[in-house]
A protein has these predicted regions:
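Long, hydrophobic N-terminal alpha-helical segment
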Residues: 8, 12-69
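Structural motif
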Residues: 16-19, 41-44, 69-71, 90-93, ...
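Generic hydrophobic/aromatic pocket-lining and core-packing "Φ" positions
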Residues: 31-32, 101, 142
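NTP/phosphate- and nucleic-acid-binding module
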Residues: 37, 61, 65, 70-73, ...
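Short gly/pro/ser/thr-enriched loop/turn and capping motifs at secondary-structure boundaries
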Residues: 51-53, 78-79, 121-124
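Ordered, amphipathic secondary-structure segments that act as subunit-interaction surfaces
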Residues: 71-117
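Glycine-rich, aromatic-bearing surface loops/beta-hairpins
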Residues: 98, 107, 112-168
Length: 168
């Protein structure tokens, strides 16, 4: 469950314990399962829309334990934050879409794996695995991520058997 995101500076890395696409961002599965398994002490949300909604940000901040630091940032600010914070604090990075995940990766955040936990059905999306759906551009972003040698895995809960994008 450990994924190391390597900073552009050699021999320095951020400890990202989970890099996950989940359109719900903070919810019960993240707080009761993933945060415990990863022993996360920080959650970074990269989302250009959520950052503009003060009410949603407040609700998310109240939904996590006080011993976990929450950073809700725009995608650009999240990239800068991850590059600048090269500490070893166990961190969960959450994004809503594969396009944002790819944007983070293409801007210098190197990852070994990407967890896909929630991409629900909506107009323009087709089911790609169980309850996970993607638009053509989202699927293209997932394929680009995979082509970089990054393990792309569908896994809702830590105890579930993961299914790799490459096996579909």
């Amino acid at each position: 469950f450990k994924t190391t995101i390597v900073n552009l500076k050699e021999d320095e890395d951020n400890m990202i314990s989970l890099f996950r696409i989940d359109d719900r961002l903070i919810h019960g599965q993240i707080m009761t399962s993933w945060s415990k398994v990863t022993q996360a002490k920080r959650i970074v949300i990269a989302d250009d829309d959520v950052i503009k909604d003060q009410f949603v940000c407040m609700v998310m901040k109240h939904a996590i334990p006080k011993d976990i630091k929450l950073e809700i940032l725009s995608t650009e600010d999240a990239i800068k934050y991850l590059l600048e914070n090269d500490d070893e604090i166990s961190t969960i990075v959450l994004v809503k879409t594969s396009e944002v995940a790819y944007r983070i990766i293409e801007n210098g955040i190197k990852v070994q794996s990407l967890n896909i936990g929630g991409m629900g059905m909506k107009p323009g999306r087709k089911t790609i695995y169980k309850n996970i759906a993607a638009s053509p551009s989202e699927l293209e972003a997932l394929n680009k991520i995979q082509s970089l040698g990054i393990d792309v895995e569908f896994k809702i809960l830590p105890g579930d058997k993961g299914v790799r994008l490459s096996s579909l």
